Amino acid sequence: LSSELVVDATGKNTKLPKWLSALGFNVPKEEMIDPKMGYASRLFRPGPGFRADWRATEVSAQAPQNPRAAGLWEVEDGQWLLTLIGINGTYPPTDEEGFKEFARALPNPLVANFLEDAIPLGPIYGHRGSKTRRRNYGSMKRFPDGLVATGDAVCSFNPIYGQGMTMASQGAIELDSVLKKRIATKAPLRGLART
């Protein structure tokens, strides 16, 4: 299979650095920040005694003494989303009792009180891939012509920042713009990855 252009948008677990190495290229410099942060989320219906004059709240961590935090949001149809957050390797558990225990250890009892008679509406979902990583392909002295990496294959963020989709969209828009200019001027795709 041959192609003038190959776009790697395979995500944060891209195999591109391994493939480049196997082809005799250096691998890109990689910068990484790992806050050792994890999340556990679950939907609930509040218990009959629940009263709140707010639709969202958060309990902030008091690190390093208490590396636990939480967010509680009304989402739709009378459902509330609770997300427990742990930093510095204090990961919130995804089992029933561990989830409640983590909530009881928060710096504020609000979430634990909510859980006392809240009705779970589904499983607990956990996430621990919170590393922010940038692969600097631009720092490579040699790079294959006709190959472009974009989105999380280049830079992936901790999902709490909400930046990943924005960066991927900006990358796609920029690639579209560069390709349109190259096609309009009949310019070759050589060197495309460095533009």
Question: How should these model regions be labeled?
Answer:
Residues 90-195:
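FAD/FMN-dependent oxidoreductases across multiple families
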Residues 1-110:
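Predominantly flavin-linked oxidoreductase catalytic cores and closely associated redox partners
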